[in-house]
């Protein structure tokens, strides 16, 4: 049974991943872990089915219950975010951004976004979604010391280039963005604000960051698996007058079948967030602030001390003096502390493989039930590695010991399956 041998090799790799992750501190800011209830939706028969189009207007038969689930998902999203319209069909955050750009722009238009070194996501740049749409990309002025958009400079830039879209939101996203100011300026030249909430969607839903919809953003996009601990996928929230344009951009424009098991899982995650979201988001930000303060006290160069370090789940650390982001991220991984190397504002964007910084996130540690005392201890462990006080192999033992106490998902529905446990369904 040669095919089964191949299956066994895959299964062994998956098993090793799960066993290893149980012993790690997952601090990559773009990840999270779903609850058992959400995870269960991902293995339903919905993953085998097709349902092109809108509920009630499908191109396939057999969608009665699929429609029921998608309508519930849309309703929950609108309720949770206070949105006039929601589309839950994008298969990723980048697809959600593409949908917004296809709905609001024409090829040859200009948009404004953040440089990658200033925290901007690649899907705001001509190498990604704007390039696919044939757009010209210019950059928002940025205050590197405050890690913030220069509001006066932004307004002048909008008046100068008259963009069709101003893209707010970021991949390195420490503080809220100036939504109201951007809306006022861009509406005067006939444009729109698209707020990419991928990283902070859960913080927004929990009322702990800013509220871009109430601040006037015309469209809010996001991925559903970062601070919002749902399945991997995307979402678009918008004002009612843009609903048809957004929906047509998603289907038939960008998505055919839209991964129905993810819609079911997202519906459960949205329901969870109505119950637990405010507390989870509050604790995530509280943990990030505590971790940043503790890292700074340990002697690390944490950005924006004068602003309280962060208002989100993220922390940025300048590790140039310790060898750079690539070296330090690798050393931390050797200690089972998982983060990512990250460009900082002064970095050459062509050297993203070896930037100055690392980015840390507290959203998954919080989901595991860790709190302020754990943040202080984790800061000590990180500093031990970054500052060379101990060998990563020695720190790894302490990390594994800490993780033994935190193996369950908190702030969610369902129990009986560990956070990073593989719920086996078949015998091999």
Swiss-Prot record:
Enzyme superclass (EC)? transferase
The UniProt site entry described as Plays an important role in substrate specificity is assigned to 225
**Which cofactors, by name?**
pyridoxal 5'-phosphate
Annotated Gene Ontology cellular component terms: cytoplasm
Which residues are recorded as binding (6S)-5,6,7,8-tetrahydrofolate? Answer: 120-122
Localization of this protein: Cytoplasm
Q: Which Gene3D superfamilies match?
A: Aspartate Aminotransferase, domain 1, Type I PLP-dependent aspartate aminotransferase-like (Major domain)
- State the family named in the UniProt similarity comment for this chain: Belongs to the SHMT family.
Function according to Swiss-Prot or TrEMBL: Catalyzes the reversible interconversion of serine and glycine with tetrahydromethanopterin (H4MPT) serving as the one-carbon carrier. Also exhibits a pteridine-independent aldolase activity toward beta-hydroxyamino acids, producing glycine and aldehydes, via a retro-aldol mechanism.
Q: What is the protein's given name?
A: Serine hydroxymethyltransferase
Higher taxonomy: Archaea, Methanobacteriati, Methanobacteriota, Methanomada group, Methanopyri
């Amino acid at each position: 049974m040669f095919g089964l041998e191949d299956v066994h090799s895959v299964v062994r790799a998956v098993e090793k991943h799960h066993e290893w992750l149980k012993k790690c501190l997952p601090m990559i800011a773009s990840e999270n872990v779903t609850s058992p209830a959400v995870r269960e939706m991902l293995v339903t028969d919905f993953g085998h089915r097709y349902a092109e189009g809108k509920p009630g207007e499908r191109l396939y038969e057999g969608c009665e219950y699929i429609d029921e689930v998608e309508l519930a998902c849309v309703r929950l999203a609108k309720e949770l975010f206070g949105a006039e319209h929601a589309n839950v069909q994008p298969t990723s955050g980048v697809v959600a951004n593409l949908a917004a750009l296809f709905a609001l722009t024409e090829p040859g238009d200009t948009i404004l976004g953040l440089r990658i070194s200033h925290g901007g996501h690649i899907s705001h740049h001509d190498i990604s979604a704007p390039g696919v749409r044939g757009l010209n990309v210019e950059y928002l002025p940025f205050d590197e010391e405050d890690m913030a958009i220069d509001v006066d400079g932004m307004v002048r830039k909008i008046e100068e280039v008259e963009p069709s879209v101003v893209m707010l939101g970021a991949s390195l996203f420490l503080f809220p963005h100036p939504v109201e100011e951007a809306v006022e300026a861009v509406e005067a030249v006939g444009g729109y604000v698209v707020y990419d909430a991928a990283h902070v969607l859960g913080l927004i839903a929990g009322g702990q960051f800013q509220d871009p919809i109430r601040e006037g953003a015309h469209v809010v996009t996001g991925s559903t698996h970062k601070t919002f601990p749902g399945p991997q996928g995307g979402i678009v929230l918008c004002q009612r007058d843009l609903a048809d344009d957004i929906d047509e951009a998603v289907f038939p424009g960008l998505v055919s079948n839209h991964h129905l098991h993810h819609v079911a899982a997202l519906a459960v995650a949205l329901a969870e967030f109505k119950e637990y979201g405010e507390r989870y988001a509050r604790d995530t930000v509280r943990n990030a602030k505590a971790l940043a303060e503790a890292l700074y006290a340990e002697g690390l160069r944490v950005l924006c001390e004068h602003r309280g370090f962060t208002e989100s789940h993220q922390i940025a650390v300048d590790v140039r003096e310790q060898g750079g982001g690539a070296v330090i991220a690798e050393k931390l991984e050797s200690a089972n502390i998982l983060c990512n190397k990250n460009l900082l504002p002064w970095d050459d964007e062509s050297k993203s493989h070896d930037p100055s910084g690392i980015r840390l996130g507290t959203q998954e540690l919080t989901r595991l039930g860790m709190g302020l005392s754990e943040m202080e201890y984790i800061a000590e462990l990180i500093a031990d590695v970054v500052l060379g006080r101990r060998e990563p192999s020695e720190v790894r033992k302490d990390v594994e010991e800490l993780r033994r106490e935190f193996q369950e998902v908190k702030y969610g529905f369902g129990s009986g399956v560990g956070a990073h446990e593989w719920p086996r369904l078949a015998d091999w």
